[in-house]
Every structure is written in structure tokens, then in C-alpha cells.
């Protein structure tokens, strides 16, 4: 019995645990925004959330086990534009080379000076995604954490069909199963030879179809580990910190009616 208790205590003390960090971040406009970063070791996920100064809520999850990244954006209505309620969108992308450090490494971080306002060390520019299909039915097969994350978006879950070929087949399914669970956008929405649908920002008829765009910037996140050389000179290297980055995302997606595009950037 004593051996069991000792083993349990050792496991509890040395095993990675979940971690939540509250980070004060200065955005591009100079305002301070609080980010919440959660590492879930048991699910192998990292989640980052923040509320923008314009009222838009952003929540990003990276599922390392299934190589799925889901960006959820909750947009409040502008009544003067005839909008009502909130609109929730979710964008799925392949995450084999995710920017975030892994959950087990994230869970070992210790926050110093929690009141400090942070600025990212490295700007990683823009990542542009043009969605080609609705993936609301496929998300549950691709990633259970992402499915829960995107549940509020309902049918407004978007992805690129090119990413379907990059996701490894799940147990009991072949690669073609994904294709049957997505709804491609109309061919005219994917036309790139100059006859494509107009962007919603320039379409004045609320009842016309168009291409909506959305921009999201994540101003601070742990994007890598730092290693230092041990002493004396030539000693073994050891982990001595994290590298932090800033990245912006631009999403393009088809909407059947102009009024379904809440124009936030």
C-alpha cells in the first residue's frame, strides 16, 4: 500500500498537468488586451482566447494529435446595418506545422510578473486561407476537441478541400470518407479567372451572393522554445525560455446573401 501511494505521488508530481496563463498583451493599436492560453495535456490541445476591443471574441484551438487547427470568431451584430444576434464562424486548417509549442511543454511554463504587458518578439506576417467548402459534418470525424470548439458555429464551419488530403485517415475510415461529408461551395465562388463573385464589402445588394472576408490578429503566443548552452563552455544545452510571436490571419469564404457577411476586419 505504501509503495502504491509513493508511486501515485511521484506520478502526480512529475507528470505534466494542464496549465492556464493570463497574459496582458499590447495589440497593434496600442490597446492592452488580456489573452487566456490553456494547455490540455490529456487531449493534446492548446487553446488561446481573447476579446477584441471592438467586441469580437476570438478563440483558437490546436489539436496536435489530429493535426487540426480551428479558429472560432464570434461577431456581435451591428443594429444600424440591420444585423441581429451574433454570428459565430469556425475555420478549420491543417496544423502539422502548428505555430504553438506542444501542450506538454506549454504546461511546464511558469508565469513571472503576471501584470507585465507583453509584446511579441517576432512578427510572422499574414496567413491567408480561402475556404472552398462547408465542413460542419466533417469536423466531428477530424477532431473531437475541434468539434466541441466549433459547436456554436453550427453550419458555419469552413475548410479547404485541399486540407482533407493532408489529414490522416481516422480509424475505420478511408480518405474518401471526408469528401462525402463536406459541401463544396458553388463553382462560381471558386472561379479565379476574373469572373469570380464580388467581395461582399463592395456588394450593395443585401440579397446577392458574394465572397466575405475576415481578418484576425493573434498578437502574442508562444511559438517556440529557447535553448541555452550549459557551463562550462561546450556543456549540454538546456531549455531556458520561450520565443513569442505575432501572426495575422485572413479568411475568405462564400456567402449566399450579402447580409450574412458581418464585415469585421
Task: For the regions a language model picked out, list residue spans one by one.
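An acidic-aromatic
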Residues: 49-105
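Extracellular/luminal recognition modules and glycoprotein regions
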Residues: 17-60, 75
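A eukaryotic "domain-to-IDR transition" signal
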Residues: 85-137, 144, 150
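Sequence-pattern detector for short linear motifs
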Residues: 5, 29, 113-115, 121, ...
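Short linear motifs in intrinsically disordered/low-complexity regions
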Residues: 19, 64, 100, 105, ...
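Cleavable N-terminal signal peptides of Sec/SRP-targeted secreted and luminal proteins
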Residues: 2-19
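Surface-exposed beta-strand edges and flanking loops
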Residues: 25-27, 39-41, 50-52, 63-64, ...
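A eukaryote-biased signal for long
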Residues: 132-265
